Amino acid sequence: MSVSTAAADQSVCTPLPVLGRDVTVPLVTGGEVSYAALDYAASAPALQRVWDDVAAYAPYYGSVHRGAGYLSQLSTDLFENARKTVADFLGCRPADQVIFTRSTTDSLNLLARVIPADCQVFVFETEHHASLLPWQDARVTYLDAPRTPRQAVETLERALADRDPYGPALVCVTGASNVTGELWPVRELAVAAHAHGARIVLDAAQLAPHHPVDLRDLDVDWVAFSGHKLYAPFGSGVLAGRADWLQAAEPYLAGGGASRKVTRREDGGVAVEWHETAARHEAGSPNVIGAYAIASACKALTEAGWDSLVTREQHLIAKVREGLAEVPEVRVLSLFGDDAPRVGVISFVVEGWNSSHFAAALSAEYGIGVRDGLFCAHPLVRTLLGSDAQTQGECGAPEAAPGEKSLNAIRVSFGAGTPDEHVERFVNAVGELVAEGAKWQYRTEDGRCVPAV
């Protein structure tokens, strides 16, 4: 479908209303413009519906599982119903547990704490650091970056078959890259993992906001995601999946809520009986607003219809990719090639530009918010840029003059709340900056490239 056809196609739905859609920001060149939020991959704006639901509940806030009063009972019901909503959203199996955490990072660190002592972990070097780093106490095999989905499956199959000893194993894989937006062959990787007696956890931080995620259909053992990327930025995340490892392990955090019974022992110490439900790993007063916000977002996306949401996002992806393709100095980063299916996450570099300088100009001169740096995926960005594994990369602005080559990139990302005008302004701004240069001078301050005023 061409951009012109898509624009006229009534099947392309309108953006979902998001908080902040009417915010204006000042331009360094004078005047104001509506803010084009194109950094959804870092944090997506709250859906208006999510905000409205949270605001409606807030006066009734009460403690969860800790009170006999009406507001406490209401809040407890809200919290547990949110758990059920998330389970339905993820297609959880009847015996699966849904645990509310702080984020994807927190979820994967929780899982890392509960894996069996002799478990081997297999993870591709292309993962976000939230998936790459939590396994420090386990035997970890880091797999080289594949250049095709088929190569990813074959690489995993070889590694699992060759493991010694042939014991418990866990594979951690992303559903969609936070750098390239490319979809990974999750179902095929799950088949490979299970064929070799391993389990698999899906990092769905970048997948769940863009595509339906179904544990049973994908046949993954666990899934992790963050509310703040799912249009519910209120401090909660989710780990959902098989209960056995979770029930067998010591609680992630020790404290009230996780304990079912605490008694004094004859030797003067204390004996603890931990819950076997999700509460085992939810010690402390839970973030009921965060959980409720995630549930609200799950309902909103489901009711909007995934077919419509995906169609609209593909329309926006086509606009951006076609626009960038018209600028010869732009190189879009990709593992699997131009034809690989992807979500609305695109990273690129511009010949003759420092990526931090380019991102700063987009913000200061056009009111466009993107991200620059290594995107918490340092090994992947080094691979995509063809640099040595030990080369120092840059997160934020380097101590370098504008135009000096840098080991970082620019990322534009969008989703259900993005209007056409935002991506059109972005494409036009890229072309104009490359053709005419920045209108302002920039300098480095506290690790960021900022206008020199």
Task: Give the location of each predicted region.
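Pyridoxal 5′-phosphate
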Residues: 1-453
